[in-house]
């Protein structure tokens, strides 16, 4: 290898070792349609092997944000990859797409093969959960841009849907009901506020277990984002889903209206689902207003589906038969934005 490059902070051999370690994780994500193997200049996928008549590709890209800072502090890297996949596949899912393949971009300050393997292991886990093939990626060593212990990760998902089965929200009307799917906690949004409230201001310790939790705070915060692909796709195939929203940055306030036609609003029945204790914990320590909480966090609901009233029972039954926790959380009305129990939050 080039000693000059190594002296500049780039260890090519460590990069090769990282690729060698990740191959077994990539291998377990293979699915119908994948062509070639890891290491080519581009990942290949043969769409003709699938039974779509008028396929439309739907793509999405996202990252994990400052949740990474907690992974650095905890030296725990095996779940961040799940987050990267979840943030992307849940987005393409919101239009009714079946995720096909995924690529990751990992930028590191120093190539640590063990740490990189842990990250990619999480990516592979997320791909398995979503039925995606991990067909490629990039690991870039960037000394001087990141410290030796830092990294950033982003993901890219491509999915497919039949052209006449894409879920656009256009069919949503006044009277549609809203089904909420439970989140696992914070997912991957709002962590700049989380860190300010709990670590900077309250000076809490990530390794300490606080009431009402049964594990250290850091582990509670690093709980990976839920992936909704398999249960939601089962419901989508019924043709009874008219709109979907992935509740990410901006919480209820920003994300639910994204699926609604102009002139319609969402009325949410506050209290119709259990809110995980991490949210009240945050609200108490940060003295945060309720509107701030719903404008930043998912508040226990990570995905929302809009259905006609006559389809409610069937759709919830399908979701629950796939192990999903589904709640009737509200309805669509005339107006704009989101209201809670008839009171607008600003």
UniProtKB/Swiss-Prot annotation:
What GO cellular component term, any one, is given?
cytosol
What CDD domains does the record point to? PurM
The record's top EC class is ligase
Q: Which UniProt keywords apply?
A: ATP-binding, Cytoplasm, Ligase, Nucleotide-binding, Purine biosynthesis
GO molecular function terms attached to this record: ATP binding; phosphoribosylamine-glycine ligase activity; phosphoribosylformylglycinamidine cyclo-ligase activity
Record's subcellular location: Cytoplasm
State which pathway it belongs to: Purine metabolism; IMP biosynthesis via de novo pathway; 5-amino-1-(5-phospho-D-ribosyl)imidazole from N(2)-formyl-N(1)-(5-phospho-D-ribosyl)glycinamide: step 2/2
Which reaction is this enzyme known to catalyze? Answer: 2-formamido-N(1)-(5-O-phospho-beta-D-ribosyl)acetamidine + ATP = 5-amino-1-(5-phospho-beta-D-ribosyl)imidazole + ADP + phosphate + H(+)
E.C. numbers: 6.3.3.1
Query: Which Pfam families would you find in this protein's record?
Result: AIRS, AIRS_C
User: What does the record list as GO biological process?
Assistant: 'de novo' IMP biosynthetic process; adenine biosynthetic process; purine nucleotide biosynthetic process
Q: Which family does it belong to?
A: Belongs to the AIR synthase family.
Name of the protein in question: Phosphoribosylformylglycinamidine cyclo-ligase
Q: What species is given as this protein's source? A: Bacillus subtilis (strain 168)
């Amino acid at each position: 290898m080039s000693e000059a490059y190594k002296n500049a902070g780039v260890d090519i051999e460590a990069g090769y070792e990282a690729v060698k370690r990740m191959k077994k994780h990539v291998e377990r994500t293979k699915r119908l349609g994948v062509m070639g193997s890891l290491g080519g200049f581009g990942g290949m996928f043969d769409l003709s092997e699938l039974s779509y008549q008028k396929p439309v590709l739907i793509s999405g890209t996202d990252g994990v944000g400052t949740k990474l800072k907690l992974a650095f502090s905890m030296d725990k890297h095996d779940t961040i990859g799940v987050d990267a996949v979840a943030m992307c596949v849940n987005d393409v899912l919101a239009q009714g797409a079946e995720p096909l393949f995924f690529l990751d971009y990992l930028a590191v300050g120093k190539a640590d093969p063990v740490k990189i393997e842990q990250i990619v292991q999480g990516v592979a886990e997320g791909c398995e959960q979503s039925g995606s093939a991990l067909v490629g990626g990039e690991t870039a060593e960037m000394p001087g841009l990141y410290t030796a212990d830092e990294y950033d990760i982003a993901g890219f998902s491509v999915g497919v849907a039949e052209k006449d089965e894409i879920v656009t929200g256009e069919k949503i009307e006044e009277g549609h009901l809203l089904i909420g799917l439970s989140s696992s906690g914070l997912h991957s949004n709002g962590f700049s506020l989380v860190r300010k409230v709990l670590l900077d201001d309250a000076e809490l310790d990530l390794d300490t277990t606080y009431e009402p939790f049964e594990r250290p705070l850091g582990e509670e915060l690093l709980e990976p984002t839920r992936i909704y692909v398999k249960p939601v796709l089962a419901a989508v195939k019924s043709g009874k889903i008219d709109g979907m929203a992935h509740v990410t940055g901006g919480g209820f306030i920003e994300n639910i209206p994204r699926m609604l036609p102009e002139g319609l609003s969402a009325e949410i029945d506050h209290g119709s689902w259990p809110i995980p204790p991490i949210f009240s914990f945050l609200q108490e320590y940060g003295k945060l207003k309720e509107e701030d909480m719903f404008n930043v966090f998912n508040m226990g609901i990570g995905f929302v589906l809009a259905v006609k009233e006559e389809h409610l029972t069937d759709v919830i039954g399908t979701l629950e038969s796939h192990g999903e926790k589904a709640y009737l959380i509200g309805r669509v009305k005339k107006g704009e934005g989101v209201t809670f129990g008839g009171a607008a939050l600003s």
